[in-house]
Design a protein with these regions (language model features):
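Conserved alpha/beta-hydrolase catalytic His-Asp/Glu region
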Residues: 1-51
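Alpha-helical elements of Rossmann-like donor-binding domains used by nucleotide-donor carbohydrate transfer enzymes
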Residues: 17, 32-36, 74-75, 102-109
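Conserved loop-to-helix N-cap of the C-terminal "lid" that shapes the substrate pocket in Rossmann-like
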Residues: 27, 70, 97-100
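Short, well-ordered coil/turn elements that cap or connect secondary structure elements
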Residues: 52-54, 80
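Short beta-strand/loop motif that positions the catalytic acidic residue
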Residues: 53, 59-61
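Acidic catalytic loop of the alpha/beta-hydrolase fold
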Residues: 63-68
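Short alpha-helix in the alpha/beta-hydrolase fold that links the catalytic acid
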Residues: 69-78
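Catalytic active-site module of serine/aspartate enzymes centered on a nucleophile-bearing elbow/loop
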Residues: 81-116
């Protein structure tokens, strides 16, 4: 299930390392994560109050992330005036570990904007 969250283009060594790190969680951790994200951590009604003039918001989603799809991200961004969205091609749910070089192509421009 978790391996499907990683883009197939990710380097094999990074893919393996990402899966190894995730597998270190005990039984039930992933199920608990999903419950939190969908029930306890459901902030859909609160996102409208985010003031992007006070705190810019950049939403980056990997195209292979089925746990937080591009559609989910776009729907959330539509509720937050000023939110910036980037769908990251050839990346999944763990972009920083599954393909660090590809992730840099997306995160560095965001960091440059923030630094201005």
């Amino acid at each position: 299930l978790i391996s499907g969250l990683i883009a197939p283009q990710s380097p094999a060594v990074s893919r393996h390392e990402t899966l190894w790190m995730y597998m270190q969680g005990g039984p039930g951790v992933f199920k608990g994560d999903l419950y939190f994200y969908r029930v306890d951590g459901d902030l859909r009604e609160k996102v409208k109050s985010i003031d992007t003039k006070a705190c810019p918001l950049y939403l980056l989603t990997g195209e292979y992330d089925f746990s937080c799809t591009a559609e989910d991200t776009l729907r959330t961004a539509a509720q937050i005036p000023g939110a910036q969205v980037q769908i990251m091609k050839e990346l999944g749910h763990f972009p920083m570990s599954e393909n660090p070089e590809k992730f840099r192509e997306y995160i560095l421009p965001v960091l440059e904007k923030i630094a201005r």
